[in-house]
A protein has these predicted regions:
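Bacterial N-terminal signal peptides
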Residues: 17-28
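Residue-level micro-sites within transmembrane alpha helices that shape
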Residues: 13-14, 27, 76
């Protein structure tokens, strides 16, 4: 007679455990628990693989007499397929185990799902997805609607791009949507190795391989300390006869799980996260976020190197803004590149939030990648001028108004261009 009561208690405990996990994910990833959608909360564990989140636009009115006249922009490519060998390595490991009869029933289901992902990546490694194209079209429309004084009449837009296909296709979608909003505009396009180096700007492109090795050693040690991979491997593999690098497998399959949100249009409903426990998602998500922050952002341990690599990009913002201030025909400068170009720039400028300097092991909480470097992340410097010719600038990062550490606003979020220009010029001199 007591059995139903016991079963009810067990079910209640399970429900409470799931509810507690949802709250813990929200806290661990720095999320204000405003969105009860479990899918969104879990997808934020994807770090820089997280797709862009569009939120309400909120603009603080400029000081009296000032109107926007020019936008200087940097946009990361939109949602994409995985780069590297994550998918291929995961598929090979599972196929080998299947051949040897070493997959559990859950492992067999995982293999079926990974085959679908591998098919979506065939001859398309790293390429933009439909969701990524949609992100850039929507971002362009929102920018044009937000600053109608800039995007009117017959003016000129200058576009620079890194050389990878996903970046070029992102640029195409953005500029086509912007052309629809401003049909009288003309667009100039340029790309090449010169622009790839400037727009990508990471430390690994500057011959400092020893720093990259130190970052890898530090993040690998963090992974070994924080990821308990044994339960996952035991659920997928039925015996140890097929050799498996358990930690690598856990990290690879988590990257595969993370990219599924970017393929939502191509693989609707496919969910690899279901093969993980809540604790595994938390640990693997933290590790991924810390790895990406250490690689590209303003970490206490390694940040000086990637920030130094963004000085040429900062100089480009400075010089092109000076040209636009002197030439009313220039409406915007658009740049399209990668996370490794944008995140260091945020640190160099001193943006509160994306440019914060914290120990890399705390970055999953204190500077979360899902918030500051999702797919299609963007920076917009919006320039304002009054009748007297005074120039102010405000910075939008992922369409949010930003504070610049160490500069006095007049008032916030508006800053004197002369003050920001002096900072950018000073940083350029430091690198010489």
């Amino acid at each position: 007679m007591k059995m139903p009561s016991i079963v009810m208690r067990i079910k209640t405990i399970k429900r409470l455990a799931i509810a507690w996990w949802l709250v813990s994910v929200a806290v661990n990833f720095g999320i204000a628990f405003e969105q009860p959608d479990r899918v969104l909360e879990v997808e934020r564990s994807a770090s820089v693989y997280h797709s862009y989140e569009f939120s309400e636009i909120d603009d603080t009115p400029p000081p009296k007499g000032f109107k926007p006249f020019y936008v200087s922009h940097y946009g990361r490519h939109g949602s994409r397929r995985l780069t590297g060998t994550f998918v291929a390595d995961t598929l090979a490991t599972l196929e080998n185990a299947q051949k040897n009869g070493d997959l559990t029933e859950e492992g067999k289901r995982l293999l079926i799902d990974v085959r679908k992902i591998a098919e979506a990546h065939e001859d398309m490694i790293g390429q933009l997805t439909e969701r990524g194209a949609q992100e850039h079209r929507r971002l362009a429309r929102r920018m044009a609607a937000r600053f109608p004084d800039v995007f009117k009449d017959a003016r000129r837009v200058r576009c620079q791009s890194a050389i990878f296909h996903r970046v070029l296709i992102s640029q195409a979608n953005f500029t086509m949507a912007l052309k629809d909003a401003a049909p009288a505009f003309t667009f100039d396009f340029i790309t090449g190795d010169k622009y790839q180096k400037m727009l990508n700007g990471p430390h690994w492109a500057r011959g400092t391989a020893n720093v990259a090795e130190k970052i890898k050693a530090a993040t690998d040690a963090y992974a070994k300390e924080n990821i308990d991979h044994a339960p996952l491997v035991e659920r997928i593999f039925s015996s140890a006869s097929s050799p498996v690098d358990a930690l690598k497998f856990a990290r690879d399959i988590f990257a595969v799980a993370s990219i599924c949100q970017c393929l939502r249009c191509e693989l609707a409903g496919l969910d690899i996260y279901r093969y993980f426990t809540a604790e595994e998602i938390d640990a693997l998500g933290r590790t991924l976020a810390c790895e990406h922050y250490a690689d590209m952002a303003n970490s206490v341990e390694f940040g000086d190197v990637p920030l130094d690599g963004s000085r040429k990009l900062a100089r480009d913002f400075l010089e092109r803004a000076d040209e636009a201030i002197a030439d009313d025909g220039i409406a915007a400068d658009l740049r399209f590149g990668h996370d490794s170009g944008l995140w260091p720039l945020a640190g160099l400028i001193g943006l509160e939030g994306p440019g914060d300097r914290v120990p890399f092991a705390d970055s999953w909480r204190d500077c979360p990648a899902w918030k500051w470097m999702p797919m299609a992340s963007n920076l917009q410097m919006v320039f304002y001028r009054n009748a007297a010719g005074e120039v102010l600038v405000k910075i939008l990062y992922n369409e949010r108004e930003m504070r610049i550490r160490g500069l006095e606003p007049v008032p916030w979020p508006y800053y004197r261009w002369a003050d920001l220009r002096a900072r950018l010029l000073g940083d350029e001199k430091k690198s010489n």
